[in-house]
Structures are given as C-alpha cells and as structure tokens.
Amino acid sequence: MIGLRKIKNTIIFIVTVAILTMLCSCCKRSEIKLGSGNEGGIYYKFADTLSDIDENITNIRTAGSQANMRLLKGGFINMGIVQSDVLSEAVNGTGDFNGNKINNVRAVAALYMESFQIIVPADSDIQTPADLKGKKVSVGEEDSGVAKNAEYILNSVSLDYNMIDVCNMNYQKSAEALKNGSIDAFFVVLGAPCDVITQLSEKMDIRILPLDDRTISYMTNLYDGYYETVIKAGTYKGIDEDVKTVGVKAVLVASQKMDSDTVADITKMLFEENDQIKKRISFANNDTKFATDNIPCAFHKGAVVYYNSIGTAITEEDKI
C-alpha cells in the first residue's frame, strides 16, 4: 500500500508540475518588438534600457520616427519611439504622410523633450537664426528629421535653404567641422544634454542660439507637436544662461491591437523604474503631466487604465 501511495503521490506531483509549467508558459507575455532608431542614438539607448528592465521587450534598430510609424502600421513592430511632430503628421495624414494616414497607433507616454539646438562658436557674429543667411550651416543628414526641423526654423525668420550654404552631415561630423572652422553653425534636435554637444564644449567654446518669442510662437502655432522649452544654464560647459528654444517630444507609442494589460504594465514601468532609466538617460521624464499633455494622438486604453489608477484623468480620446 505504501508503495502504491508513493507512486500515486509521484504521479500527482508530476502532473502538477506539468500543469504549472503549462500555465506559466501561457502566462508569460509574448515578445514586444520596440522600434527605436540608429544604434548609438538616444532612441536606441532608451529602448535598450527598457529591454534590460523587461526581458520581454526586444529593441529593434530602425531608421527612426518615420520608419517606426510605418512599421507599426504594417504590424512589423508592437511599439515605437517617435517625434511628436512626426506622430502628428502620421495620424492626421499630412506632411510626409499626406495620403497615407495611420490609424492603428496609440500614445503611451512622452519620454523626454528633444530640444532644437543651433550651435555656433562662442566668438561668432551669429546671434540669431536670421544671421545664418549666407553662412555655411549643417542641417543634418539629407531627408532626416532634423533637416526638416531646421527648414521650419529658417522659414520662421524668412529664410530658406537657398539663402544659406547647406551642408548635410551627421551630428558627429558637424561638430568636427565646426571645431575645425569649415562650417559656421549646425542644427541638433536631441535631448539636452546630449553627448555630441557636451564633448564639443570640452574642446571649444560654444554658444546656443536662443529663439525669440515671435519665432517660438510661429513654430508652436503653425506646427502640431512643437513645444516651447528651455535649455537650462549649466547644461553644457560655457552655457551660463538659460536658452529659450522649441522642441518636440519623444513619444512612446503602441499598436492599437496591443494587449491592454501589457501596455498598462509598460506605462507603469516607465514611472516606477524611472530611477533606473535615469542612470542611462539623465533627462528621462518622470512627470505624468508632461507624459500626457498635448500629445497629438489618442491614448492606448492600457495607458489610460494606468494613468487613471494614479489619479491622472485622461481618456482614450485625449489628444491635441
């Protein structure tokens, strides 16, 4: 009898383990493909940080905001990081998405502000964006987001690309060209502080051109997804006063089809693990007001569940 009881208990144990294993397998979240950007960029670094915190997240290297929106539309990724101005164009079918409106993407949270930074040597006679007329200026790589942003800034002061000597270089090459005197200025659209300007400020004295109230009003009123912001004194070596400028938000978005519980968990992680995120991205946002204010896209219902649970009242329809 004892032998039979042992056999019976062993069978029960094996069956229980099998059932638990099967249940755990079923409960485990599916892989979450998160579209980021170019390796070495902040989008890639941010996505890498999230994947370190949540093993179900896989960082997918992409060409950036526009690519992420199109990959989400096609169902090739589950989530993506995008500039707020690109998000606005995509969900409204304007600009680069004219006739190609994207309806299946929802907002999760704004992650941080990407500030427009126009860098010149400290001793330059260039004081405002209008002074760039006739100057040799790097506006970022051809067809990049920063190139479009730079064009908008120039338009705001009645300039266009035909009125400056345009160079199309990436940030690192632009910084090197400014240092050796082969260009007069370059545009950057990144979270501040960013490595490329921090490193340049250690090698030469620089200034960041401020934007006046008229230019800021022009940018924020004419284009959805642009915001007034300030680069604080001390952000970079030699920048001893606050610099008024504009920026776009880096926004985490998700496919509308994504499981609500999963999106709620990821939204929660952004805030509860913010100290961990800030170890790698010092300017990562931890304010729910910033995360949800004036986002040009409806929110995912999973994100809404989390925000409402902590007293931030939004709905799935909240957008600009």
Language model regions located:
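Acidic, polar ligand-binding/catalytic clefts
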Residues: 74-113, 123-125, 191-196
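Extracytoplasmic small-molecule ligand-binding "clamshell" domains
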Residues: 42-73, 78-79, 239-240
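Pocket-lining segment of extracytoplasmic ligand-binding domains
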Residues: 84-86, 94-96, 124, 161-252
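An extracytoplasmic/periplasmic, membrane-proximal ligand-sensing/linker region
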Residues: 169, 173, 179-180, 190-208, ...
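Ligand-binding clefts/hinges and TM-proximal coupling segments of bilobed small-molecule sensing domains
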Residues: 135-152, 223-298
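Bilobed "Venus flytrap"/periplasmic-binding protein-like clamshell domains
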Residues: 29-57, 114-180, 293, 297-302, ...
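Bacterial N-terminal signal peptides that target proteins for export
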Residues: 2-13
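C-terminal motif of bacterial Sec signal peptides marking the signal peptidase cleavage site
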Residues: 22-25
